[in-house]
Amino acid sequence: MKKSIMLIAAMCMTSVMTFAQKVIRVSTDKTDLVMKVSPKGRLYQVYLGDKFLNPADYDNLKWDVYAASDGAVCQRGHEVYATSGAEDFFEPAVAVTHADGNMTTYLYYKSSVQKAVEGGTETVITLQDKVYPFTVKLHYVAYAKENVIKAWSEISHNEKSPVTLWRYSSTMLYFKSSKYYLTNYHSDWAKEGQPETTQLSTGKKIIDTKLGTRAAMQAEPFFELGFDEPAKENEGKVMLGTIGWPGNFRFTFEVDNVGALRVIPAINPYASDYKLKAGEVFTTPEFIFAMSDNGMGEASRNLHDWARQYQVNMGMDDRLTLLNNWENTGFDFNQQSLAELMKDAKDLGVDMFLLDDGWFAK
């Protein structure tokens, strides 16, 4: 009997140690996203930044960053996909009302796999609730050469009746810096893509749209983050992100009580509760981001290289080019000025000339 008890205890300790030592690494040539499983089986982000040269450095990364720092009884960290109704105090990545009406979800690490895909490596992490047959699969594709990471989530369940999703984020990322500067872009007629930079302070900043098919009319689904200082073109640590979704989107930026920033890209949950049937899989849009220590220029070029290579149809093929007179002349043009533009365009090898707003001029 004593031997059986000791064996069970040893097995439990081994299980805990296995969880505690489990490290999941999503890496490009220059960036590491590192996650750890806690002794109780929860998954936490422990690092996102410059790539480690020595793998032994992972052992120094702690998951329980909030322990004894905020007066909480429980140990908490940057949970990779924080849920509503659990011990996390801030904006969740997913919120669900289960079939029995309960609105609490706890996700535990179940498994992870990595496989080679075109241009990179895909990591799939499976999280499950211990009480409900509710599952979230986190997908990350790291493109090593381009230094770009793509992330999305799959949500499913096998409960007795449909569950209601009222938050469903593509991913959740955390950063720790002395200051955070957000640059977003807003638009209006003849004022497209106007940049605006704001220093983030404690609390939430939300960039979103509820215009449906006109989603990008006043807010662009793209942002830049500068760490310690506003994002610059050729220097400084930055992160650029965009969501692959043409409809209502929402970017949430929340600075917590210890100065950590969480970034949550998602479909806008406004008037968008989703009834998920048993066995059905809800797939979120992809979130694509790039980090750089050399400013926005490098990160932007990396995103463009990635998009041409892997996302845009025939992105590496030659493209027809077009010259629109609007940027050159506005409404102030005539036949002679247009003829000069056409000649210059031909000399440059431009394929087509477009006369814009021609009815307003001579």
Explain the meaning of each model-derived region.
Residues 22-35, 43-254, 270:
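Polysaccharide-binding surfaces and accessory modules of carbohydrate-active proteins
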Residues 302-314, 349:
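Conserved oxyanion/phosphate-binding beta-strand-loop segments in alpha/beta enzyme cores
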Residues 174, 288, 359:
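Flexible, active-site-proximal loop/turn residues at the rims of small-molecule/cofactor binding pockets
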Residues 143-146, 154, 159-163, 245-305:
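Extended acidic/polar, glycine-enriched regions
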